[in-house]
Amino acid sequence: MSKYSVLLPTYNERKNLPIITYLIAKTFDQEKLDWEIVIIDDASPDGTQEVAKELQKIYGEDKILLKPRSGKLGLGTAYIHGLKFATGDFVIIMDADFSHHPKYLPEFIKLQKEHNYDIVLGTRYAKDGGVYGWNLKRKFISRGANLLASTVLGTGVSDVTGSFRLYKKPVLETLMSEVTSKGYVFQMEIIARAREHNYTIGEVPIAFVDRLYGESKLGMDDILGYLKGVFSLLFI
């Protein structure tokens, strides 16, 4: 039986973590699949790590792995850190704030099995996908950014910046060893490099919902950094 490792980066997710963990565990147990969750916490001051330790008591330390870091060191490096401890055949990355609902996990897994895909992406921009909780400006920026990146880089996928994905573990290990970007460009570079390797990619339409608790911000610096990143990836 294949095993699935979920990498869950956290920062101030005390309120969300118990619910998202319950739903992930419930989904895998209903599908009769072997699983683990690797929680990578960046020194959250709100008690996220204490909540994670309580979850270990409930589900077991073999199911909930807490691998904290000393501070906010970036999303990309969080995945790299968490991957060191993942023991699954497949690795799933997703957000802990309910932007990505665990109900889609069976669809990811089914699609991967049917086509033996190296990567399965959750896409907001294919048929039946969508974004909820964002204002029109942010929707426009996100959609435009994805169209720009997919056109310029020729990725062949509809959502290059989403962070709800399933990977064959060796594939992710290869990509992580090569990626150099940080921030919003990180996910995009992963896909660009995947295409260089001719890895196969499938897509599952998802409804992306803005975070349940806490704040989500997108500033001009993020936008400018993204544009710079798109064109820098032309030369990888």
Curated annotation (Swiss-Prot):
Top-level EC class as recorded in UniProt: transferase
Keyword Electron transport recorded: no
Keywords, ordered alphabetically: Endoplasmic reticulum, Glycosyltransferase, Magnesium, Manganese, Metal-binding, Transferase
Gene Ontology CC terms, in alphabetical order: cytoplasm; dolichol-phosphate-mannose synthase complex; endoplasmic reticulum; endoplasmic reticulum membrane
Main location: endoplasmic reticulum
Protein family according to the UniProt entry: Belongs to the glycosyltransferase 2 family.
Protein name per the record: Dolichol-phosphate mannosyltransferase
